[in-house]
Amino acid sequence: MLNYSLRPENRGKNLESSWQYMFKTYPYLKPWIDSLKQNQALKDTFIYSPDHVKLHAYYVASSRPTAKTAVIVHGYTDNAIRMMMIGYLYNKKLDFNILLPDLRDTGLSGGNAIQMGWLDRKDVTQWMEVANRIYGDSTSMVVHGISMGAATTMMVSGEPQPDYVKCFVEDCGYTSVWDQFSKELKEQFGLPQFPLMYTADWLCQLEYGWGFKEASALKQVARCHLPMFFIHGDKDDYVPTWMVYKLYEAKPQPKALWIVPEADHAHSYLFNTEEYTQKVK
């Protein structure tokens, strides 16, 4: 189960396929990306994590000088390219600087397994520091994630934050890795939590140094006192909608919640682009 979940066949490594998917799904992205490339405005940067994993991100400065900066975090088996629609929202529509990391074992980043947000929270925190340096050491920053990227965002939110971090946006993130894997085990294979979940959890602790219950967005949001905007589709059956109510309840004020009518998993922006943009704005 551990390899099935953390080392799936599709790990967001096919960049050309990712670009093709994004241009087909969001046709307005291609002229924007082409313009960025023509003007050498879409840039790559690499860093090393404390455990010596090479990590990659794309970044794009706003067309006008600004402190407003968004760090945008992708979902499970996706990569930074697959979050370019949110990059467009912030950079093209709202005039933000943006940085979009490839999480471990996706895109151009190293690593040997997906980390479900828990180790990624440390990497994203490092990327937030990098983005602040790139954009002048005096940014006003939002962190925005979708799906596993939203869980990562919430896991980040429970850590101590520098003054430049102002708020978080989580779109359809799960309560914990334990809850999400338990749900998938039951739905895909008809199996109970015991014994497989407990065995896989133990193996994850041995191999990666973290456990399924430890990797809890629910516990982390309870420690966050910065503003957070929760978004979830009411037709989401992959990360079920009930999870957002528990997360929202656990988070201290200030907070806001938007349940998006008729939206399934990770498609709230696709199906409600203008309203999504206005609410994030």
Region spans (language model):
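Alpha/beta-hydrolase active-site loop
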Residues: 114-135
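Conserved alpha/beta-hydrolase
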Residues: 90-110
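Short alpha-helix in the alpha/beta-hydrolase fold that links the catalytic acid
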Residues: 86, 217, 226, 240-249
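Short beta-strand/loop motif that positions the catalytic acidic residue
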Residues: 223-225, 230-232, 236
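The serine-hydrolase catalytic nucleophile loop
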Residues: 76-90
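Hydrolase active-site cap/lid region
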Residues: 155-210
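An N-terminal hydrophobic leader/cap segment in hydrolases
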Residues: 1-47
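Catalytic histidine neighborhood in serine/cysteine hydrolases
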Residues: 248-266
